[in-house]
């Protein structure tokens, strides 16, 4: 017998440049309806939407090169939006208010899940952040891999070939 989790409680990100990243993340979290719980010169912790995002500066002896999503550790994080319009609103905010580097603007990603729609951008340290909307039940609904009559688990994801990075 397993346990049915209730989402992700929080994610903690360690950044090289807290002077730029802490305000970036605090503003983004506030736009996403979260509230600041902890704030100091190198840390911000925002909660809401059934999760928390904690961003803190790396200790001086642990700062390193730029973030790279293919190194061991975090690849990217993704916030689930309630509508395509919310994804579009986040896009406008990160471009016009945060000046974020957009990896891809809102686009269809139905190769990942039925109706998948997403935006991908980077924080000042290069950490990749996605905001997506998947209507209905996604993979568990009609037309989904795990829904009624679905094909079941895949060995690739959305044509990305997510089999592992070792060659």
Describe each model-derived feature in a short phrase.
Residues 1-22, 77, 135-167:
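N-terminal beta-strand motif that seeds the catalytic metal site of vicinal oxygen chelate
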Residues 15-20, 78-124:
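Vicinal oxygen chelate
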Residues 63-86:
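Helix-adjacent hinge/juxtasegments
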Residues 5-7, 70-73, 113:
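Short glycine-enriched loop/turn motifs at secondary-structure junctions
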Residues 122-138:
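Short, contiguous alpha-helical
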Residues 12-59:
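Core segments of cupin and vicinal oxygen chelate
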Residues 59-65, 139:
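A short, acidic/glycine-rich surface segment
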